[in-house]
Amino acid sequence: MKKRIRLIALAALLLANVHLFAQREKLLKNNDVEGLYLTLADFKQDKLTRPTDEQHEGDKIKLKQFFISPDIISIEQGMETKFFKDSIFAIHLINGKNYRFINRTPYLIADTSNLYIYTYKTTKTVFSTSGPHRRSKEVPVTYYYFSLAGEKGVYPLTLANVRKYALTDPAIHIAVCDKFTTDKMLEEINPETGNFIINELILKLKK
């Protein structure tokens, strides 16, 4: 009976790990990358740098463990070019998504309609106590950040930071603070447009 319970517990743990892996940002393959935005100006102008045309044998972009390595290597006709992640603005994928590197960490550029809003998916350990036993489990979590029009300064998406850095107009400041009363509310997205509601409100108030 005890052996059966252990097997059931092990199966549940394996299923949880599979689900957890699906929640993480997936490691990208070399052929996921279409090009690079070397600067913020390039990103705003949609000026994509394609370091390789992939027309020659061996042409490729090597992400070198995309989520932890400090650089990206492109190979074009046998010649290597190194791009440091902290010196370029973003990487553009063939699926249309863009990641901005902040301290070498890839943040998905989720919305640029007003504030630049970024998301970062990872996991965190949660502990619980049941009688004499203390258990831990990994749960998926998404962190939200923002910057002003893609500028260098990036801040956690909280009411305190939005008030401090983004709401310089008194009328907009009051309207935003009246509508959003918790940090969690700032994460709300309009399902029809895919944009963050705070961005839509600020744009509406600016008209």
Regions found by a protein language model. Give the residues of each.
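Generic N-terminal leader/processing signal
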Residues: 1, 15, 119-122, 193
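C-terminal partner/receptor-binding element of secreted or periplasmic proteins
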Residues: 171-207
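Bacterial Sec-dependent N-terminal signal peptides
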Residues: 1-28
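Aromatic-patch recognition
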Residues: 26-176
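Generic low-polarity alpha-helical segments
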Residues: 21, 80-83, 195-202
